[in-house]
Each structure stands twice: as structure tokens, then as C-alpha cells.
Amino acid sequence: ADLPVSRLRTVVEAWAFRTAEISKMEGIEQIFPFENHGQEIGVSLAHPHGQVYCYPFIAPKMEKELQHTEAYHEKTGGNLLKDIMNAELEAGERIVMRNHSWVAYVPAAARWPLEVHVAPVRDVLTLDQLNDEERWDLASMYSHLLKRGNAFFTEHIGHPSAKAETSRRIPL
């Protein structure tokens, strides 16, 4: 949360670069970039750091989510994730913030006290497909969300920030 937006933009660039490079590798089915902040969540390093997990399969939770998005698309012709975001925008009750490129909202069935989902306004499948403005907007939103979360506590909060991607096409 203390990093300037320009440094968080570097994190977004790293996610996008690694996604693009790993996507070229044979046998990779799921890419999972994430950042860890704080020993409270079980990290062994005291400083914030990122990693990228790459799987030769789609993890069970992601597989289930893909099945739901595909079934929804077959039934309605729509994009489940986009329709959820639009419903959240219409209701307006759980919107945390919005900028030109992204919407941050608390999901209806949040599993954690400070859980926030960040969704792109434009249909994109992977981080490397983001344009320059979207990358800056994501870095800016990420900064604001971290600061808002930390405002609830006397110490910085420990948290993971994750983006699950898959090589399978999601119906847009």
C-alpha cells in the first residue's frame, strides 16, 4: 500500500509479461499469478513478493467456475462474469470503487472479511491483453484498495492478491 502507483504498475507489467511468456509454453493449462503481503497469511518472507504458479491442468475450483460460465453461456448466450459485474453495478450496493477500466465489488457470498473482486470493464481473457490505460487503471485501483483495506487497522493487513487465468477460452 505504500508503493506509488508507478511501482504497482511495474507489478501489473510483470503479471502481464509472465502471462504472455508462459502462455507460449506447451502443456500449461492454468496460470496463477499472485502477490503475498504479510506474515499473517503464512508467508515466510517479511516483504511483499509475487509468484506465478503454472499448472499442466485446470485446478478443480477453476474447472468448476469454467463449467458454470460455459453452462451459463449455453443457456443464455451471455457472459456470466460480465453479467455478474453488470448486476453489481446496477444494484450499486457492493461497489467498492470504479474507474474507466475496472470495477471493484464485494461478491454476494464473500468468503473473507475484506474480499474484493476486481473485474475489467472491457472483455479480456488474460492480463497480457490489457492496453496501456487498463494497466494504469488497474495499478491505481490496486493502490486505492490496499490503502482502504489498511485504513481499518493500525498495522498493514496481511493479504494475498491473486489473478487466476486459464488457457481455455471463456465465453465472452
Regions found by a protein language model. Give the residues of each.
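HIT superfamily nucleotide-processing domains
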Residues: 1-172
